[in-house]
UniProtKB/Swiss-Prot annotation:
It comes from Thermotoga maritima (strain ATCC 43589 / DSM 3109 / JCM 10099 / NBRC 100826 / MSB8). HAMAP family: MnmG_GidA (MF_00129). PROSITE patterns: GIDA_1 (PS01280), GIDA_2 (PS01281). The gene is mnmG. This is tRNA uridine 5-carboxymethylaminomethyl modification enzyme MnmG. The keyword Metal-binding does not apply. FAD binds at residues 18-23. One of its GO terms (biological process) is tRNA wobble uridine modification. PANTHER family: GLUCOSE INHIBITED DIVISION PROTEIN A, PROTEIN MTO1 HOMOLOG, MITOCHONDRIAL. Homodimer. Heterotetramer of two MnmE and two MnmG subunits.
């Protein structure tokens, strides 16, 4: 960028509005694919900030982080660099729901992400609050910031998080903010409405922070980092972290709930003067929500989590609230271990604008303005991981379109990111959307352990994954298949030695010869247990893990692949984007209206639109078949 004239410094290939988790992945993807990127943000010192819990991952979300990594994104690597406590969740529940969750040093995470943006030669990170989207003949042209500066770009990606007309609530006190301590974007919503976007209002919240020295950890349950070496990124060597930053578990009690009920009338959500209109997240309710909706529960869990190495603040996971400050102090100090808590930052709720994601294509490009993309919380989602997953897809697709190449659309059967985006653009949102394992029909195929096997080919195709890594994935795939075939051919015959081992492992002895493949199907037996009988076992733990899962769950996996084949039949049945739905006979009025609005790209997507019934689909297929003849 050295030596650029001022006018050149206002012209870019891609402009990213916002530098949160979605904006980071979008900017890095487009820049690494060779395009000049401008990132405009309210505060360049809070890039990739974690305004709520200082953690990355969890059920479904942790798999998304691995998928981002497999596509060539940054979240997994930076989490590995900055995590202070990490655990594998749901180990006893099987591979379909296993996921990593890490406590991050939130200050270090933000600084690391800022450095990665600033050191990329194709990225300029700059302060600016975007107030208007510039368009020309139905195509995006650029943006205007709060200084009145016009920036021109061939593509614009909006990743504004909670900043669109953001408003904070603490009891009956309310003030404009994008998040605590930062200005909101007050004018951009008006520009989006002028362009035809439908805008709604959601709310979320965050708990108070308390000072470490005021916490009595001795009466809480300690939760240390894992003893097993772990890593989010496929590029990083798994490691065991020092046990310097444990999390702690305590609980609310009847006194806590009594205090909450006493102050409900001052709540902006439940009070006599209801100030909050936006709908909050179902799966991350405030403590007052939990007390009101679950009256029979005498206690709720509170996880006391460190915010980082260079701060003494702790996060009270489970005590999100918008009650008045006085009520917060009393409530917190009623909890075991927090009797003398010093609150450093109050809890608050925040209300913000989002756009209806049904106005987007599965590429995350807007249907209303060409080359205008949206990603993250502005699309009605909640969570850092969901935002980052959308961000990398928006960045990749903006770059692919500028290259003149086909877009990247992940299927529901390929990735949790595919499930997330398909749900958004097909069904829309009436509450903040959180990704859950239950939302994925094919979750046994979308595992934590196989994200690179599923998605590295796409990362390599678009230029975000290096050749050596892709070849490593192909080699791994080959070795897995070879080992499965070998196990089918190696026969074990009944003998005293064999049966003694099987009996000691609490499984039935052999009466006739069987293959190692058949033996490994037994739930009591692992690959390592059978090594004593195997003349030529392998030692690669990554291959062993995949072999075990594929052998033990073969029936379920095969059934899912059969379901995917049916699913893809309808996914591959394309619907012309300009189809005149008024010409399709016998559609219900509701179906016709929704098909016009969403304009599904395939019969498969049309089938997932709420309110579209089987007879509507049949009539649509009949009409399309006749048009083809």
């Amino acid at each position: 960028m050295i030596g650029l004239r001022p006018e050149d410094d206002r012209v870019y290939d891609v402009i990213v509005v916002g530098a949160g988790h979605a904006g980071i992945e979008a900017a890095l993807a487009a820049a690494r694919m060779g395009f000049r990127v401008l990132v405009l943000t309210v505060n360049p010192d809070t890039v990739g900030w974690a305004p709520c819990n200082p953690a990355i991952g969890g059920p479904a979300k942790g798999v998304v982080v691995r998928e981002i990594d497999a596509l060539g994104g940054e979240m997994a690597k930076t989490t590995d660099e900055t995590m202070i406590n990490v655990r594998m969740l749901n180990v006893s529940k099987g591979p379909a729901v296993r996921a990593l969750r890490a406590q991050i040093d939130k200050i270090s995470y933000s600084r690391t992400m800022k450095r990665k943006l600033e050191t990329n030669p194709n990225i300029v990170l700059r302060h600016g609050i975007v107030e208007r989207i510039l368009t020309e003949k139905g195509r995006v042209k650029g943006v205007v910031d709060n200084y009145g500066i016009d920036y021109l770009g061939k593509a614009v990606i909006v990743t504004t998080g909670t900043f669109l007309r953001g408003k904070i609530f603490i009891g009956r006190s309310t003030f404009p903010a994008g998040r605590m301590g930062e200005f909101p974007a007050t004018k951009l919503t008006e520009s989006l409405i002028e362009l035809g976007f439908e805008v709604g209002r959601f709310k979320t919240g965050t708990p108070a922070r308390v000072l470490k020295r005021s916490i009595n950890f001795s009466v809480m349950e300690r939760q240390d980092t894992s003893d097993e070496p772990l890593a989010f990124s496929f590029f990083d060597e798994p490691r065991v972290l020092p046990k310097d930053y444990p999390c702690w578990l305590t609980r609310t009690n009847p006194e806590t709930h009594s205090i909450i009920k006493q102050y409900l009338e001052f709540s902006p959500l439940y009070g006599t003067v209801k100030l909050i209109e936006g709908i909050g997240p179902r799966y991350c309710p405030s403590i007052e929500d939990k007390v009101v909706k679950f009256k029979d529960k005498e206690s709720h869990q509170v996880f006391v989590e460190p915010e980082g190495r260079d701060t003494e603040e702790y996060y009270l996971n489970g005590l999100s609230t918008s009650l008045p400050y006085e009520a917060q102090i009393k409530m917190i100090r009623s909890v075991k271990g927090l009797e003398n808590a010093i609150v450093t930052r109050p809890a608050y709720a925040i209300e913000y604008d989002y756009i209806d994601p049904r106005q987007l294509y599965p590429t995350l490009e807007s249907k209303l303005v060409e080359n205008l993309y949206f990603a993250g919380q502005v699309n009605g989602t909640s969570g850092y991981e969901e935002a980052a997953g959308q961000g990398i897809i928006a960045g990749i697709n903006a770059a692919l379109k500028l290259r003149g190449e086909p877009p990247l659309i992940l299927k529901r059967s390929e990735a949790y990111i595919g499930v997330l985006i398909d749900d958004l653009v097909t069904k829309g949102v009436d509450e903040p959307y959180r990704l859950l394992t239950s939302r994925a029909e094919y979750r046994l195929l979308l595992r934590h352990d196989n994200a690179h096997l599923r998605l590295a080919k796409y990362g390599y195709r678009v230029g975000l994954i290096p050749k050596w890594f892709y070849e490593k994935v192909l080699s791994l795939e080959r070795r897995i298949n070879e080992e499965i075939e070998r196990l089918k051919k190696v026969i074990v015959k009944p003998s005293d030695r064999v049966n003694d081992l099987l009996t000691s492992l609490r499984t039935s002895p052999l009466k006739e010869p069987v293959s190692f493949y058949q033996l490994l199907k037994r739930p009591q037996l692992s690959y390592s247990a059978l090594k004593f009988l195997d003349p030529n076992p392998i030692d690669d733990p990554e291959v062993v893990e995949q072999v075990e899962i594929n052998v033990k769950y073969e029936g379920y996996i095969q059934k899912m692949f059969e379901e995917v084949a049916v699913f893809e039949k309808y996914e591959n049945y394309e619907i012309p984007h300009d189809l005149d739905y008024d010409a399709v006979p016998n559609l219900s009025t509701e179906a016709r209206d929704k098909l016009k609005k969403i304009r599904p790209r395939s019969i498969g997507q049309a089938m997932r639109i709420p309110g579209i019934n089987p007879s509507d689909i049949s009539n649509l297929i009949i009409y399309l078949d006749r048009k083809k003849q």
